[in-house]
């Protein structure tokens, strides 16, 4: 069963809390991040979002999707039937095709946005039937491309904590 989360208003948009923290809904489009007055001082975030894929993709892609995307390699990007022949670590197999002889998966993480958000000390807020869970964004990325996210959890939003002093950042 698939359920659309598109209509959940709290998962869209960018706002500033009374504490000064910036909240970015997981369904906020990357183009919205680059055009936001609230995020104007976050130069590295704006630059990273503006470099993701093409303008057409940035108009559809969300910040939540970008930070939670799968790691990829040439092997993993093949058809399901082809990958089943001799699975890699990520698919329960015993090898990494990206780097032969590696004892673990070394597929590359593709997000441009996640490293920038981690540099700001961002937190990820997940929701499920059990409630809400807030964790440092950096802590959700585990070995072999896995993420510390339960199957019933949905990324609700990201929080950039209020910074003391002048914020200076860059992304190239």
Language model region names:
Residues 1-172:
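C-terminal structural segment of proteins
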